[in-house]
């Protein structure tokens, strides 16, 4: 069995989905292999991204020789996805409809000067919301809202689901949760990790006593479009474009529900959210006149600095991450041999930002450094065991969640407008890879964030795909004024009260890194009490400078 070079799951930059692939033979030149059946791949991409340079063509030829199966997979899948079938409900079906144009037309006077009450280009966005009857689904007894952000100009519709805090919603902070992928629904985070309930194999609701909404209100957002309950006739294929949508959603949501706009607001997420969150936070902070009280960001097992992080796949797979080796000495040496070329390709992507540099880097590096581990059948999200359910990204619960969310009564209760719900949309995953988004150096945004807000990077130590070694390494390699102080900071134990140690933390200035024991890619699922503990302590300002 051969594997694709990209397919993330649950938000991981993984190569987890098997595709039927064949190595091209015959008399074709290497570059001729990169064609979509019935159309020229090159002409399609040059129309969108500009003409390929001679240097770029040489790189593509090289990658085709080094990773022919991976390029063949690319060829087969470089086809624009079809729109997600959906049927928009009348505005009369919703309890609230907020027009972005109306919000944008609001002006206030400050120091004798008039300016917009809420900055940003909101005129093409609208927000729809409905109050969810807690008794209808039994997820939680708290106040809930669901709905869509509509980009009317581009036919994009982002689904969200809000749960009020179980504790003190008038004063508790608000958290936006984002799963990764790119292309995985944040409702998987709701039901598998940190939401108020989970779904069992009989599709029954099971209460989560360690839900993150114990002491915070939480918004779960399906983004980018065509993920989960979100849909569009067009698509988003890069993180920056997705950031504009998220800013509009939050601006209109807090306008409609001002009772939550004064509370502290935090963005949290995992995996490819390591790309999303720096960009989304930067977009929010770029608007001086805003109704979003952003106080911090949290990234769990994220992909943020690929140049640094990809250097730690071999150590993690070969017994240097705290768990037994998965690969033999020969395979480990082959990964060591592949790393310099991988890092040179990523560095070219970092410097040029061009799709012609970034896509070959993704194809080669994923094939060389993730592929060997994946072919063992070991779970890329948890090095401690095998992938038990490959049809559901190793976790049967993902299938239960999809089945539950596809029930007509559930979709009706939430106002969902799509014909079907999918936990992960691999077309989106490929779109982001094909647009060169995978290795964009968004970690370079983090120093600017640290000037204004605290940043927490946490990592379960059993994850392979976005492992703790790589996450620790990029936090220490990050160039910012507090780098020396952070790297010399004392590493302290993490424990619930006087209980058993569940991890280690290092913090200096506005920057904090946590290693969490016995947790894979999805920390709140594997260590629910520990994740609840560090979340509440973080929101309470324990590690803030």
UniProtKB/Swiss-Prot annotation:
Superkingdom of origin: Eukaryota
What's the name of the protein? Carboxypeptidase Y homolog A
Position of the signal peptide? 1-17
> Keywords of this protein's UniProt record, alphabetized?
Carboxypeptidase, Disulfide bond, Glycoprotein, Hydrolase, Protease, Signal, Vacuole, Zymogen
Q: Which family does it belong to?
A: Belongs to the peptidase S10 family.
Q: Where in the cell is it found?
A: Vacuole
Give the record's GO CC terms: fungal-type vacuole
Function field: Vacuolar carboxypeptidase involved in degradation of small peptides. Digests preferentially peptides containing an aliphatic or hydrophobic residue in P1' position, as well as methionine, leucine or phenylalanine in P1 position of ester substrate.
List the InterPro entries: AB_hydrolase_fold (IPR029058), Peptidase_S10 (IPR001563), Propeptide_carboxypepY (IPR008442), Ser_caboxypep_ser_AS (IPR018202)
Record-listed E.C. numbers: 3.4.16.5
One GO molecular function term of this record is:
serine-type carboxypeptidase activity
The residues that carry sugar chains are 215, 510
Q: Which cysteines are joined by disulfide bonds?
A: 184-424, 318-332, 342-365, 349-358, 387-394
SUPFAM superfamilies given for it?
Answer: alpha/beta-Hydrolases
Q: Where is the active site?
A: 271, 463, 521
Chief subcellular location: other
Removed propeptide positions: 18-130
Keyword DNA-binding, does the record have it? no
């Amino acid at each position: 069995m051969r594997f694709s070079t990209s397919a993330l799951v649950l938000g991981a930059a993984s190569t987890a989905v098997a595709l039927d692939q064949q190595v091209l033979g015959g008399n074709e030149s290497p570059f001729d292999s990169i064609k979509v059946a019935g159309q020229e791949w090159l002409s399609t991409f040059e129309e969108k991204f500009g003409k390929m340079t001679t240097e770029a063509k040489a790189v593509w030829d090289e990658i085709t020789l080094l990773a022919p199966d991976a390029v063949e997979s690319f060829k087969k899948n470089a086809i624009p996805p079809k729109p997600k079938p959906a049927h928009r409900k009348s505005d009369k079906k919703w309890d609230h409809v907020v027009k972005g144009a109306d919000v944008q037309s609001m002006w206030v006077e400050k120091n004798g000067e008039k300016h917009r009450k809420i900055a940003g280009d909101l005129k093409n966005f609208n927000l729809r919301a409905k109050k969810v009857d807690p008794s209808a689904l039994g997820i939680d007894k708290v106040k809930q809202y669901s709905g869509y952000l509509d980009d009317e100009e581009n036919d994009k519709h982002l689904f969200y689901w809000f749960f009020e805090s179980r504790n003190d919603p008038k004063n508790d902070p608000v958290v936006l949760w984002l799963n990764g992928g790119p292309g995985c629904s944040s409702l998987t985070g709701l039901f598998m990790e940190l939401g108020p309930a989970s779904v069992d194999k009989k599709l029954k609701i099971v209460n989560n006593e360690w839900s993150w909404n114990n002491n915070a209100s939480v918004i779960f957002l399906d983004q980018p479009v065509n993920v989960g309950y979100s849909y569009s006739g067009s698509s988003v294929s890069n993180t920056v474009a997705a950031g504009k949508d998220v800013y509009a959603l939050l601006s209109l949501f807090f306008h409609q529900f001002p009772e939550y706009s004064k509370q502290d607001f935090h963005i949290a997420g995992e995996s490819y959210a390591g790309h999303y969150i720096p960009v989304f936070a930067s977009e929010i902070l770029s608007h001086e006149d805003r109704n979003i009280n952003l106080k911090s960001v949290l990234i769990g097992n994220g992909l943020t600095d690929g140049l640094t992080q990809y250097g730690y796949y071999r150590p993690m797979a070969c017994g240097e991450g705290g768990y037994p080796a998965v690969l033999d000495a020969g395979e480990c040496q082959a990964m060591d041999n592949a790393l310099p070329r991988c890092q040179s390709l990523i560095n070219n992507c970092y410097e040029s930002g061009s799709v012609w540099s970034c896509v070959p880097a993704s194809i080669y590096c994923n094939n060389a450094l993730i592929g060997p581990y994946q072919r063992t059948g070991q779970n890329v999200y948890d090095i401690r065991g095998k992938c038990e359910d490959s049809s559901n990204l190793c976790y049967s619960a993902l299938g239960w969640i999809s089945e539950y969310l596809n029930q007509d009564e559930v979709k009706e209760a939430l106002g969902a407008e799509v014909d079907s719900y999918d936990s992960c949309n691999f077309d989106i995953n490929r779109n982001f890879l094909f647009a060169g988004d995978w290795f964009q150096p968004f970690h370079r945004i983090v120093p600017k964030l640290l000037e204004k807000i605290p940043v927490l990077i946490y990592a379960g130590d059993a994850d392979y795909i976005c492992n703790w070694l790589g996450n620790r390494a990029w936090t220490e390699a990050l160039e910012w004024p507090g780098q020396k102080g952070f790297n010399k900071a004392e590493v302290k134990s993490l424990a619930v009260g006087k209980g058993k140690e569940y991890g280690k933390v290092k913090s200096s200035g506005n920057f904090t890194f946590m290693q969490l024991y016995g947790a894979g890619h999805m920390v709140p699922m594997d260590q629910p009490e520990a994740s609840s503990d560090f979340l509440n302590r973080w929101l309470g300002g324990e590690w803030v400078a």
